[in-house]
Amino acid sequence: MNTTVAVPRAIIWKGDSITILNQTKLPHVAEYKTLTSIEDVWKSIVMLEVRGAPAIGIAAAFGLALAAQKYEAINIVEFKTKFNRDCNYLGTSRPTAVNLFWAIDRMRAAIEEVSTIKIAREILEEEALQIQQEDEQVCRSLGEHALTCFQDGDRILTICNAGSIATARYGTALAPFYIGKEKGIHLHAYACETRPVLQGARLTTWELREAGVDVTLITDNMAAHTIRTKNISAIIVGADRIVANGDTANKVGTLNLAILAKHYQIPFYVAAPLSTFDTKKKTGNEIIIEERDETEVTKINGQQIAPAGIHIYNPAFDITPHEFISGIITEKGILQGDYTKEIASLFEK
């Protein structure tokens, strides 16, 4: 059995604008929003209208292509000066997502040797489209590899949203659910709600249900009980940054699940493309963890749920040490062993 699964798309290039699925409105409304400036793109990333490491990179690439169309420059030097300014500006939007900087660096490199403004604009648009197309192919390949870790009927726990709307298509951690459905392999997702912004409750459940994949929602503090009582086969998560030794930054709460997986002796997988790896950093201690606004914790849908003036700690990510990870699933295959050596071999020139 091989069928095509219809999955939602988060980013659409229109030539002179970008259309995004506004993920802050889900699951109540599937609202598509038009972005017409680099400032719009920056704000959409900061406000989590676009989120997920690969999608952030894609949005940034299109944002730079869009900005380049609007520069009033008298020569290529002035053009590149404005372009580099916008690259630096976009880099301030989400400091933990390595795909953002990967895409920015790739767009910079694409026009490094270009000597005319017209060609620079054309190349930037082509490069952004290529980044999006490559990500779809990468997610498909990653999903094929991930599917080999599971069997028909498996119940698999996940956190946050590492799905189609966090990438060009298919997703990373959710890719095996979609590829499995295409092949007639039934996988049942258990989705942690993912406080404080509820990406699991709002986004993962929405997109899986839209695609006809079985999904059960749990609160974050139900994870241990669910693993123990619901025959959970494995845990699979995405990543925002993986460093040279395999330490992984992902949505806060991921480390909790890794510890639980070790206790209950079930596999804990990280699914991420090579663009999410940061081999310049040796361990997770070097990763900068973004801290977000306290109102994400003190309010739900604008309703205050905590005492006014209470101290808040709101890290967006945590670090899972490599020794808790059963396998890192990439488009090139599954790493299971000495992560430092295996990751280094992936990036050997």
Swiss-Prot record:
Binding site for substrate: R51, G52, A53, R94, Q199, N250, K251
Disulphide bridges, residue numbers: none
Known pathway: Amino-acid biosynthesis; L-methionine biosynthesis via salvage pathway; L-methionine from S-methyl-5-thio-alpha-D-ribose 1-phosphate: step 1/6
Keyword NADP among record annotations: no
One matching Pfam family: IF-2B
UniProt-annotated catalytic positions: D240
Tagged with keyword Isomerase: yes
Sites annotated Transition state stabilizer: C160
Catalytic activity: 5-(methylsulfanyl)-alpha-D-ribose 1-phosphate = 5-(methylsulfanyl)-D-ribulose 1-phosphate
GO biological process annotation, one example: L-methionine salvage from methylthioadenosine
InterPro entries given in the database record: IF-2B-related, IF-M1Pi, IF_2B-like_C, Initiation_fac_2B_a/b/d, M1Pi_N, NagB/RpiA_transferase-like
Family: Belongs to the eIF-2B alpha/beta/delta subunits family. MtnA subfamily.
Quaternary structure, from the entry: Homodimer.
UniProt name for this protein: Methylthioribose-1-phosphate isomerase
